[in-house]
Amino acid sequence: MTCSLLPSEQSSGASFLPKSNASFPWGSLDEDELDDSLLEFSDGEEDDGHFSFTEEEIEMLLKDDDGGHNEYRPRKSQILPDIPQENSLYSLGPAAETPGFLKLPQLSTSVGHGPTPSKSLNRHFVLEKNLIKVTVVAPFNPTVCDPVLDKDKIDSSKETENPASLREQTREDDPQPNESKRCTEPEGVSPNTSAWDGPLLSSPSNNNIEQTASDKNIPESKKPTPVFSQISNHSEVPNRKNSGSHKSGCEVRIPVVSSSSNRHAFDKDSGEAKGERRLGKVIPVLQTRTRMFSQSELEKQKDIYLSKVIAHIEDPGDSNQGTLGELDALMDQVHMQHPDWQHPSDLTTRNYARFRQRPLQRYSLSQWVDRNKRSHHRFQRLPDFSYSPYVSSHQQ
């Protein structure tokens, strides 16, 4: 019988090869002469799965697989040990040691739509197979489960009134215990549905039926809240008396929380929505102030203004223009008494002589032109002063 090494065993078996550089004659070896001692358990090592077969059992399984599923099912019940339903899904107990623990060349089982690849019957296959069984949901008969669920919905409202009578009524409403048991317990493996061994998981609705039957024996104050009801009633107060629902697990409703930020925060004190606080430039709002004026004061100011205008029209020099007029009159008087004093309003008067040591020299136009470089390019476009004989003689 041919055996194939796993990748992990091939890597570990490479250390047993000779370390010489000479090429090893692999072609001289025969497959029948391979040592199967690597596949056996070492001292103190035990199998942690429930699928330990001998060579005779493996050959029988291959014959049954070729013969059909009808012969395979009674043989499977004799070979496979009886496994409890509760411990088969999550526990992997140790099994008896089997010296002839080999890998099957091909184990074709029809699951789904196509054949699965061959798997070795070792601990890796046991772990992978048990993980697959956990994810498979057992089929159930809806014609049997639906009436039971409908009766639980009706009887849940009367649960607080008379739990003892409800317990008796539940027993009377189940005329076929074998069929109702199929709702709460998974069906056995049949050749028409699947070829997986062992029990399968029950549906969420079946777990709900078992929980309903167990809750009827517990007082209302001590009943634990189920897990799916805590999720579905997250935003509501958990009240089993007024809920009146033992719904299927597929009808669990989860509240959706909006992730968008609220632009208006609700003020609990005033009951109004606050605007979003923004940082930036604050534009002040001008507040209007009311000023009170007496009618008599307005008439008095009006008379003063009219009298000033009329006086200025009649005699502009002698008219008093207020404070500014008084200042102008004072400066005129000082300038008349002291001619050397420059009037502040005389902006055209240039009196640079008082800042110089030498007296101011006066020049004619031609002299000024000669002193300021007549040949300069700035004066090239100036016209000739032909009207002056002095300038014309200078040009010649």
UniProtKB/Swiss-Prot annotation:
Keywords: Nucleus. Residues 145-249 are annotated as: Disordered. The keyword Nucleus applies. Residues 202-215, 227-246 have a biased composition (Polar residues). It comes from the Eukaryota. Residues 148-161, 168-185 have a biased composition (Basic and acidic residues). One of its GO terms (molecular function) is calcium-dependent protein binding. One of its GO terms (cellular component) is nuclear speck. Interacts with S100P. This is S100P-binding protein. It comes from Mus musculus. The lineage of its organism: Eukaryota, Metazoa, Chordata, Craniata, Vertebrata.
